[in-house]
């Protein structure tokens, strides 16, 4: 689904089961977008749409707390850790700031604090967040944000950045200090790097942020050393007891500067809200002239004691706020409108534009979302239009400029047949979504389904990337997922740019994927609207593929995260003979699906019937894994502590939930004691 499709659904009239499914689907969608943005640095929706959807999810859950998803973006920051680097646990969680989008909202933040306060103001750099750990004043290691709990150890790459101190400039360094900042590439360096990349590698980065993030994730630090990356520090994380913390945020930044760190030369200390407005006005007008990209401004309460008093939410500090700039808009011309086909057959119109520079990037394509949007905005081929781009996303056409319309401008109509396979296109429930009915017979759907099948959270065939999938489909070497497991060395080496070593790596990766968990397999086969959370719930409920295949609608709607819409999709999937044939072919070629491990004792006297809250991070358990384990032995896992809570299971970096449990006298169980009870 697209953001507009989420907004178009009349959720206020949905039945409870449908509303729960809608909330779960929205939470899954936001988790995926968070992963694309924070981990892969490849967002596909704008920051503005993400923020609107996040607020929608917040509002829905506030009104329907019984439907709050477990481990959703409401509790997390960012996405999951990318494989390939050693994973390091943050000593102090890397949180993110709440966002505001207008001066009115910024004023509300200011007015909520019942004090006459100073705010430390600074630009919001658009780069890669990093945490650098120093031991006795010497560089120890560097870690990316990751999911906020743990990140990727990228020490060798970060050490190549010229302005990163390898030793703190002080004669009396603290025993331990964690400095946080943003790694960026300035605009001029970005243009120079892209010129080099285009000449030598025939590819370019979309923007400076992607260039910085991509550089830090390279395995060859010698290549990274040649790139003019820069670190701007904005604060500290963990620190040892011997560190003398300054009294104000502004003094902290000056201290970091004295240690040898670069801080923004556009920092400002506002003594009242009038000065905040002046700073906002100044930076908004100077933004385009800065040497580096910024996507907003950050405002922090200056007094450190007041920061401590105000405290934190699960997502981040309550004493700071990020103001996000509006997306950039420019004028262009629609040269043509083409229709693309997605994994589920959804038809998406895309405008081919007269190339135009937006935010330092040349844009020639923009999404039109759906045919209803085209008609609502009255966009025609040949029109002059306003194009908006925010971050590394597909730009969108905001509106047409009919006052400049030529007499030969063409009205855009939805095709009746698929532009790829010529199958009939059908409207879905009179909504904005039109779908190709070709299914596996449509090459576009086949390609996207296969990309989904091999993806990291599905079968995890990591060496079989999107471009190679496209090559294999175009060469008629694969059509259905099982065909992947029939590929041989000769077929792969016969493809363009596939050497012997690369081909063998692909085959090894395919072999490694032959024993997926049931949850992964359910997710991989691509049943419409089934995400990770739903796949886990289905796998844990049914326990085997055979039981899942025999699932009845009445049973499905009783499962957590499965509403009537998803239940219907599952039943329809298993009624399709081609789907059954595809799954049976998997089993015939030796795919061994691993069923969920059943707990020896279905119930545990320590947890059966108990209401349990989990807080903090754990060395031996993932949060989702622990939640599922506790549910499987009869516990009721909830997200908030109250008088009805029987126990709180507490990991590292526990926050307000632990404090509230202690205030209410609720039993607290530490990880060291948890194994014995389980």
From Swiss-Prot:
GO CC term (a single one): cytosol
Binding site for NAD(+): 47-51, 96-97, 122, 145, 182, 300, 324
Cofactor requirements of the protein: Mg(2+); Mn(2+)
Domain BRCT: 602-678
Catalytic reaction annotation: NAD(+) + (deoxyribonucleotide)n-3'-hydroxyl + 5'-phospho-(deoxyribonucleotide)m = (deoxyribonucleotide)n+m + AMP + beta-nicotinamide D-nucleotide
SUPFAM superfamilies referenced in this protein's UniProt entry, alphabetically: BRCT domain, DNA ligase/mRNA capping enzyme, catalytic domain, Nucleic acid-binding proteins, RuvA domain 2-like
CDD domains: BRCT_DNA_ligase_like (cd17748), LIGANc (cd00114)
Enzyme Commission code: 6.5.1.2
Molecular function per GO: DNA binding; DNA ligase (NAD+) activity; metal ion binding
Active site (UniProt): 124
Residues that hold Zn(2+) according to the record: 418, 421, 436, 442
Enzyme class: ligase
Gene Ontology BP annotations: DNA repair; DNA replication
InterPro entries on file: BRCT_dom, BRCT_dom_sf, DisA/LigA_HHH, DNA_ligase, DNA_ligase_CS, DNAligase_adenylation, DNAligase_N, Hlx-hairpin-Hlx_DNA-bd_motif
Keywords recorded for this protein, A-Z: DNA damage, DNA repair, DNA replication, Ligase, Magnesium, Manganese, Metal-binding, NAD, Zinc
Transmembrane parts of this sequence: none
Biological role stated in the UniProt entry: DNA ligase that catalyzes the formation of phosphodiester linkages between 5'-phosphoryl and 3'-hydroxyl groups in double-stranded DNA using NAD as a coenzyme and as the energy source for the reaction. It is essential for DNA replication and repair of damaged DNA.
Family stated for the protein in its record: Belongs to the NAD-dependent DNA ligase family. LigA subfamily.
Name the UniProt record assigns to this protein: DNA ligase
Native source species: Francisella tularensis subsp. holarctica (strain FTNF002-00 / FTA)
Gene: ligA
């Amino acid at each position: 689904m697209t953001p507009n499709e989420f907004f178009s659904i009349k959720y206020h009239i949905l039945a409870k089961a449908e509303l729960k499914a809608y909330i779960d689907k929205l939470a899954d969608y936001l988790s995926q977008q968070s992963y694309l943005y924070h981990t892969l640095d490849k967002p596909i929706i704008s920051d503005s749409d993400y923020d609107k959807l996040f607020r929608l999810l917040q509002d829905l859950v506030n009104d329907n707390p019984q439907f709050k998803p477990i481990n959703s973006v409401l509790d997390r920051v960012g996405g999951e850790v990318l494989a390939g680097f050693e994973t390091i646990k943050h000593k102090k969680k890397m949180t993110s700031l709440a966002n505001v989008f207008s001066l009115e909202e910024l004023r509300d933040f200011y007015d909520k604090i019942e004090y006459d306060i100073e705010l430390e103001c600074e630009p919001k750099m658009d780069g890669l967040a990093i945490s650098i750990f120093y031991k006795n004043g010497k560089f120890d290691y560097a870690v990316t944000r990751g999911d906020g709990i743990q990140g990727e150890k990228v020490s060798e790459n970060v050490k190549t950045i010229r302005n990163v101190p390898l030793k703190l400039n002080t004669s009396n360094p603290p025993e331990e200090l964690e400095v946080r900042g943003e790694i960026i590439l300035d605009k001029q360096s970005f243009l120079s790097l892209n010129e080099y990349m285009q000449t030598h590698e025939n590819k370019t980065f979309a923007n400076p942020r992607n260039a910085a993030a991509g550089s830090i994730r390279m395995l060859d630090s010698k290549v990274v050393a040649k790139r003019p990356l820069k670190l701007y520090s904005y604060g500290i994380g963990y620190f040892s007891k011997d560190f003398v913390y300054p009294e104000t945020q502004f003094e902290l930044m000056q201290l970091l500067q004295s240690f040898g760190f670069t801080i923004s030369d556009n920092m400002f200390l506002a003594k009242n809200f009038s000065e905040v407005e002046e700073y906002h006005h100044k930076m908004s007008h100077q933004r385009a002239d800065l040497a580096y990209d910024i996507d907003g401004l950050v405002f922090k309460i200056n007094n450190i004691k007041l920061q401590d008093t105000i405290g934190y939410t699960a997502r981040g500090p309550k004493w700071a706020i990020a103001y996000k700039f509006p997306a950039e808009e420019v004028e262009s011309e629609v040269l043509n409108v083409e229709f693309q086909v997605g994994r589920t057959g959804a038809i998406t119109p895309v405008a081919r534009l007269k190339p135009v520079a937006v935010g330092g990037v040349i844009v020639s394509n923009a999404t039109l979302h759906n045919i209803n949007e085209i008609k609502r905005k009255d966009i025609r081929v040949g029109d002059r239009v306003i194009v908006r781009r925010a971050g590394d996303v597909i730009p969108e056409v905001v509106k047409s400029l009919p006052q400049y319309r030529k007499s030969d401008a063409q009205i855009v109509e939805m095709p009746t047949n698929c532009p790829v396979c010529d199958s009939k296109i059908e409207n879905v429930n009179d909504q904005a979504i039109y779908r190709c009915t070709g299914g596996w017979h449509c090459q576009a759907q086949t390609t996207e389904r296969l990309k989904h099948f091999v993806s990291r959270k599905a079968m995890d065939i990591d060496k079989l990337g999107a471009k190679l999938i496209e090559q294999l489909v175009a060469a008629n070497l694969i059509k259905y997922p099982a065909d992947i497991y029939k590929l041989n060395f000769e077929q792969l080496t016969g493809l363009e740019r596939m050497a012997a070593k690369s081909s063998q790596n692909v085959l090894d990766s395919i072999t490694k994927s032959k024993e997926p968990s049931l949850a992964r397999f359910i997710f991989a086969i691509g049943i419409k609207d089934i995400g990770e959370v739903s796949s886990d719930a289905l796998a844990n409920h049914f326990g085997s593929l055979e039981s899942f295949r025999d699932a009845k609608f009445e049973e499905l709607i009783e499962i957590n995260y499965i509403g009537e819409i998803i239940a219907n999709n599952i039943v329809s999937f298993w009624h399709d003979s081609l789907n059954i044939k595809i799954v049976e072919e998997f089993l015939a070629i030796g795919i061994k699906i691993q069923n969920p491990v059943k707990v020896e004792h279905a119930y545990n006297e320590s947890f059966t019937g108990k209401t349990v809250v989990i807080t903090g991070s754990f060395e031996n358990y993932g949060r989702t894994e622990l939640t599922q384990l506790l549910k499987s032995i009869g516990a009721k896992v909830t997200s908030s502590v109250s008088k009805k809570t029987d126990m709180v299971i507490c990991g590292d970096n526990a926050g307000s939930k632990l404090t509230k449990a202690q205030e209410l006298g609720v039993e607290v169980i530490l990880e060291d004691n948890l194994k014995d009870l389980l």
